[in-house]
Amino acid sequence: MKIIGHRIGGNIVSDKSSRFGDVFNPATGEVESKIALASIPDVDKAVNAAKKALPVWSETPPIQRARILFKYKQLIEENIDELADLVGREHGKTLADAKGSVVRGLEVVEFACGIPHLLKGEFTEQVGTGVDSFSIRQPVGIAAGITPFNFPAMVPLWMYPIAIACGNTFILKPSERDPSCPIRLTELLEEAGAPAGVLNVVNGDKEAVNAILDHPDISAVSFVGSTPVAKHVYSRGSLSGKRVQALGGAKNHMVIMPDADLDQAVDALMGAAYGSAGERCMAISVAVAVGDVGDKLIEKIAPKVSSLKVGPWDDPEAEMGPIVTKESLDRITTLIGEGEKAGAELVVDGRNLKLQGYENGNFIGGTLFAVSYTHLTLPTNREV
């Protein structure tokens, strides 16, 4: 079976790992590969590689770093189908959704290509008698990024292109559920001309995260994920003096007023609620219908939810793919059952969906509740 190792200093490394996890294909429910889970020595090795690359990279002229990023942008565009397939195969997103997420990340690479202008300092003459003032922008050193499962291409691309464009080196800890796309993105950056060690990938769980947060040679950490983990990253990382950015989760509602264009509202709601199987912080999980618009809304949206085309990532007709893990699927079906028990009307029940040839996949159909003010438990549950 394929072993997914860490990418450190331009090489795939797994021989020092004593712990391994499973990477599943959520459409089939089968183990696609084994992944090496980093411990402290693995993180130390990545830090040493980043430290070795830092002097040369930080002294590389910004315009030269930008040229490498322009080439990187080109390589991502040329390999976008492969990258989207890696995302879909391990996360479950439809190929169209996966490709769109790569494109959103690519926009940050394009922004990073303009870094020479953004790195200009400031100079002010005579701020006081005989006193001039100036500021310069310099790399902070080694930065790290800890990213979630739901956007294995887009969120890493939010982070490291800017960091490395500014002359820093970087250590990425992607989700252990879908690591292949981040590793491939690292290979493409090296192919574009970035020296080995500028971008390193360590796979792992909480042990790897804590090793990154505690390491004295890592100067900055960025995180995107759930709110409890964001609090942990912020508190533990800042203890050692790191610059920490921690973006927690979100809970989104759509409010539909009585004078709304319901056709437009339904189209927007279908994409926002069921895109990426709802596994994103931008997802709409609750729509608040004001006044008497609720019944009209249900009448219009229920047929669309019922006919939502669910399928594997590589089905070009699929509108929604599987849930990323069996555990997440079980949690969702449990919440649906709890909603029923609380008295909410289950208008469309997507449970127990089985697709021919994918009977072991983590699939659930579109599901729709109608909830009145007397049954508010479901829409106020943070887990929904």
Q: Which functions belong to the PLM regions below?
A:
Residues 1-131, 324:
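N-terminal Rossmann-like NAD(P)+-binding subdomain of aldehyde/semialdehyde dehydrogenases
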Residues 29, 65, 87, 109, ...:
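Residue-level signal for inorganic ion chemistry
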Residues 47, 66-73, 84, 102, ...:
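Hydrophobic face of alpha-helices
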Residues 54, 58, 73-80, 84, ...:
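Structural signal for hydrophobic packing residues in well-ordered secondary-structure cores
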Residues 121-264:
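Rossmann-like NAD(P) dinucleotide-binding subdomain of oxidoreductase/dehydrogenase enzymes
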Residues 228-373:
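ALDH superfamily catalytic-core signature
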Residues 374-380:
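Conserved small/polar residues in nucleotide/adenosyl-binding loops
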